[in-house]
Amino acid sequence: MVHVRAKDAVGQYGERVAVRRLTEAGMTVLDRNWRCRSGEIDVVARDGDCLVVCEVKTRRSVSAGTALEAVTPQKLARLRRLTGEWLAAHPGVNPPRVRLDVVAVTVPERGPATVQHVAGVS
């Protein structure tokens, strides 16, 4: 039997919600949870001719700050480096534009999750 920590389950749920939001917005998901030695990219998608690298942050409440506040300048710098590594690992992908997005998901104890998609955060 595989045991999933509650925090991990919330994060996985948030990523599923985020992917649904991105696809409903017309994007095509190219990769999920891509990992390399330097870290992980939550979602890589295509929005027209633009490659979108998306950080997903999920919170149960805003008591420790919002999900968007958790995306620091250091996190964005790391995401930019990871984007370069993803592109190097996928030589057939040569987008004319690359954009970093954040999808913030808040999962309350009751009721539906709230989702905020911020395009072009860096």
From Swiss-Prot:
InterPro entries: Restrct_endonuc-II-like, tRNA_endonuc-like_dom_sf, UPF0102_YraN-like. SUPFAM superfamilies: Restriction endonuclease-like. One of its GO terms (molecular function) is nucleic acid binding. It holds the Pfam family UPF0102. NCBIfam families: PRK12497.1-3, PRK12497.3-3. Belongs to the UPF0102 family. This is UPF0102 protein Krad_1407. It comes from Kineococcus radiotolerans (strain ATCC BAA-149 / DSM 14245 / SRS30216).
